[in-house]
Amino acid sequence: MNSLTDKVLIMKFYEASNAGVKVDLIVRGTCCLRPGIKSVSENITVRSIVGRFLEHTRIYYFHHNGEKKFFLSSADLMTRNMEKRVEIMFPIFSGYLKQRITQWMQIMMSDNVKAREQSSDGTYHYVKRAEDEPIVDSQQTLFQLAYSVGEDEE
């Protein structure tokens, strides 16, 4: 997403973290949640990917009772979007689409070129790539995937 500023939803993320739920967030811009605080958000990571493209997907993925649930949305998690705008969120049922979205999320979570992780004090640092790790620029990789899609896949 682009922004996470809604206090109610941030508190829900903290509750989930305290219940032992692992939460990985990709928030391109403003993020008021603070990850990695003991007994508050120690199970939460926040990363930001800012590159050539104004890219911020709004994919919401949940693993619930052994079932993978995927949703796409028009909304960032901002109070104004939750309270004052008409937004939409819809589920993804297609197994094929779930596989593609999973691939995209894995690519974004593997980015070690443009990705930065947020520290508990709100500062960001670039993700460090291990020497034996391949270089992953998620925006470039996703661009190449989109460019290579055949007409029969559209």
Enumerate the language-model features and the residues they cover.
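PLD/PLD-like phosphodiesterase catalytic module centered on the HKD motif
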Residues: 1-154
